[in-house]
């Protein structure tokens, strides 16, 4: 049986996150995308310390779609190197699993 998978990413702003999220949900690659605007980031980029405003994103999908979700994010994302972190939950509520798997059929 497939396992649930959370994908953490960031977007330059709320609208970009919602637009990419809607495309991923419509393609049945993810069941849901949560986007939190107003995040402040400090990060190292090409040898410099940068600051910026971003929106955090948390995607809910199944592990079997990992590579397709990653490819779709990279293709749609405006960042040169988008952050894509896979988080494997140790468990989930049965109803939550049924919902995620029902919304993201094996492809």
Task: List each language-model region with its residue ranges.
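Positively charged, small/polar-rich N-terminal and surface patches that mediate targeting and assembly
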Residues: 1-107
């Amino acid at each position: 049986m497939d396992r649930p998978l959370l994908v953490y990413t960031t977007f330059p702003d709320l609208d970009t996150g919602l637009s990419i999220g809607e495309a991923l949900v419509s393609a049945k690659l993810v069941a849901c995308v949560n986007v939190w605007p107003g995040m402040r980031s400090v990060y190292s980029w090409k040898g410099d310390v940068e600051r910026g405003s971003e929106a955090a994103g948390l995607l809910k999908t199944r592990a079997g779609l990992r590579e397709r979700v990653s490819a779709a994010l990279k293709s749609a994302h405006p960042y040169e190197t988008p952050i894509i972190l896979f988080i494997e939950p140790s468990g989930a509520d049965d109803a939550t699993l049924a919902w995620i798997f029902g919304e993201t059929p094996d492809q």
